[in-house]
């Protein structure tokens, strides 16, 4: 795929599905018109500081953090049928082979399959972008997220019941299958 085709694929990415409660959910690339809505969602997120110190507790720090994700990442949002953001995932460049992934589903929309679809969408985009490995860090106590990541093929690089657990997904096999 040429860089132009790759960018077009990423820019136009969208995926819709029906969640476990029967609601239509659209996952699409974050566009300029949604930046303020994403910031407002993170400012309203409760409890703040609930996953690895994120979102930041102080409003100013939270806004800066969201802008950094918008600027530095490839961002997807999950939208409910009325257009409200119910989840967010981002891929961040580490180096030519590796990227980092962050995924958040707002608490009232958890356990509906949205997180799993966001993770799968990020994996798809990371693959399309040519990355060989997706890395993430998750709070050891966040068993729901750890289950989703394992279900999507991630393997634990570290373990424990306290602190953070590092996980990674090797995409190299997927690249070789295409050739």
What is each residue range found by the language model?
Residues 172-179:
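Short, charged/polar, Gly/Pro-enriched secondary-structure boundary elements
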Residues 23-40:
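A short beta-loop-alpha structural element at the N-terminal edge
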Residues 116, 128, 140-158, 163:
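Conserved active-site alpha-helix within GNAT-family acetyltransferase domains
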Residues 109, 113-121:
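Conserved acetyl-CoA pyrophosphate-binding loop and the N-cap/start of the following alpha-helix
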Residues 98, 126-137:
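Conserved GNAT acetyl-CoA-binding A-motif
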Residues 1-23, 169-171:
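Acyl-donor-binding surface of acyltransferase catalytic domains
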Residues 106-108, 112, 140-141:
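Active-site acidic-Proline motif in GNAT/NAT acetyltransferases
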Residues 43-102, 106:
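Acetyl-CoA-dependent GNAT
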């Amino acid at each position: 795929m040429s860089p132009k085709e790759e960018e077009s694929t990423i820019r136009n990415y969208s995926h819709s599905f029906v969640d476990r409660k029967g609601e239509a959910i659209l996952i699409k690339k974050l566009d300029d018109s949604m930046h303020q809505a994403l910031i407002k969602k993170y400012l309203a997120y409760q409890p703040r500081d609930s996953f690895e110190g994120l979102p930041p507790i102080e409003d100013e720090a939270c806004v800066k953090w969201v802008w950094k994700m918008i600027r530095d990442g490839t961002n997807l949002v999950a939208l409910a049928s009325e257009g409200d953001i119910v989840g967010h995932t981002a891929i961040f460049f580490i180096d030519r082979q590796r990227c980092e992934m962050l995924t958040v589903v707002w608490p009232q929309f958890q356990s509906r399959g949205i997180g799993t679809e966001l993770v799968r969408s990020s994996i798809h985009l990371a693959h399309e972008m040519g990355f060989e490995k997706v890395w993430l860090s998750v709070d050891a106590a966040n068993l729901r997220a750890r289950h989703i990541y394992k279900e999507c093929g991630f393997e634990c690089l570290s373990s424990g019941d306290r602190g953070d657990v590092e996980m990674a997904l090797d995409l190299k096999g997927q690249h070789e299958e295409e050739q």
